[in-house]
């Protein structure tokens, strides 16, 4: 397990999609994370950056899409997403209205 000193190297960006907006009402937040980060590192990073208590972390590895261009085929880079559920009674994360990052 590689130790990453800075938690901002683990949490890369919030995911902006209809699904992620809908999940925020249920206290579930979605982030792009480093491909080599594990669930424990993600939990610690979210708690340090946003000052909240995390109940669970679910991760999804997404393979890069194959895309065609004029010169042939290419592949978008693969990503890893983390669905972070906060504990009951924990403060919500104001991702899109504040300058936390």
Swiss-Prot record:
GO MF terms, alphabetically ordered: rRNA binding; structural constituent of ribosome
Q: Does the keyword Magnesium apply?
A: no
| Keywords of the record | Ribonucleoprotein, Ribosomal protein, RNA-binding, rRNA-binding
Respond yes or no to whether keyword Repressor is given for this record: no
Which Gene3D superfamilies does the protein's record reference?
3.30.70.330
Tell me the subunit arrangement.
Answer: Part of the 50S ribosomal subunit. Contacts protein L29, and trigger factor when it is bound to the ribosome.
Q: Which family does it belong to?
A: Belongs to the universal ribosomal protein uL23 family.
Any Pfam family matching the protein: Ribosomal_L23
What does it do?
Answer: One of the early assembly proteins it binds 23S rRNA. One of the proteins that surrounds the polypeptide exit tunnel on the outside of the ribosome. Forms the main docking site for trigger factor binding to the ribosome.
Concerning InterPro entries, the annotation shows:
Nucleotide-bd_a/b_plait_sf, Ribosomal_uL23-like, Ribosomal_uL23/eL15/eS24_sf
What PANTHER family does the entry give?
60S RIBOSOMAL PROTEIN L23A
User: GO terms for biological process?
Assistant: translation
Name of the protein described by the UniProt record: Large ribosomal subunit protein uL23
Origin species: Corynebacterium efficiens (strain DSM 44549 / YS-314 / AJ 12310 / JCM 11189 / NBRC 100395)
One GO cellular component from the entry?
A: ribonucleoprotein complex
